[in-house]
Amino acid sequence: MKEHLTIDKKHKLVYCAIEKIGCTFWKRVFQIISGFKNVTDPFEIQAIRAYEGYLTAKGLPFDQIHFILKQSKSFIFVREPYERLLSGYVDKLFAPNAAYWAFIGTFITQNFRQNATEQNKKCGHDITFAEFVQYFIHSQHNNLRRDAHFVPNFEHCRPCEIDYDYIGKLETFEEDTLFLLTELQLDDKVKFTNFQSETERDAITDAADYVYSMRRAITKCMTMHEALFRAYRKLQIRGIISKHVPYPFTRDSQRDITIDEYKQELLAAHAQSGTSESRKANRKEALLEAYSTLPDDLLQQLRAEVKIDANLFDYEELPDVIRTAKEYKPSFKYFDVLM
């Protein structure tokens, strides 16, 4: 837990970071208030540069952590468990991510896939959501290959042991963030031009930066065409690019495209994608498609794993949208690149 506690002694703040719940954003806020970055807008800092310039509790003894918590305002953000699990899968295994393919993907193909090919076992680049859920449940029961992007919210931040002053939710992230910045008297130090549009542009930039930063490792397992298409599909799953805006490249036109050209095409696709309200349907459809692939027994096992998070943070153990997902018949398939 210690490494998740981000501390700012000057402002007497403690933030417990939970992966897949806006933690990259809040780490950039802490870079600003610590003076590490001389900007006021967190979105001016590249997401891939958000992992330095602030203090964590990792090397601190528990008595000192206890003292800091007593002197500070503390907060966490949580997220609906089924949506968070899918987000972790999309970001770390479905989208191009050679590091997670090597560490988690290969483990999954070797342990949860019948008749896996040697390429599957070597690369781990084509994991299905059902295979991922099998791995997640197994890792929780056996403490093998567990990863912070997937383990439940409560395991990160021990909310039964630490009485956090504020608990925000990703479902109301903008509203809760602006409230917190005002409440903590940080609104003069941290400012935005347009929170929502900057969030979406940030996601586009990060998707491009990440796939190009790992290009050499990724192309050992798939072509760059396939990798860039998956990054595009990830943005569609997130509701940033409409499902109605077709992928702008062919295999031939894309062969030597630069990162700047790719970003410009992503931004152009986003500009053609309509309102955020219309794009929200993408997220629900992708959720239904993913969970429709789980057999009933696996879904019930998963329900047991998310039960504590659901009860602690006022979510449903098995929402109707998840329980009835197997009845869903998609007209547009977000995960068809794995077929």
Which residues does each PLM region occupy?
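Membrane-interface amphipathic segments in extracytoplasmic regions
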Residues: M1-M339
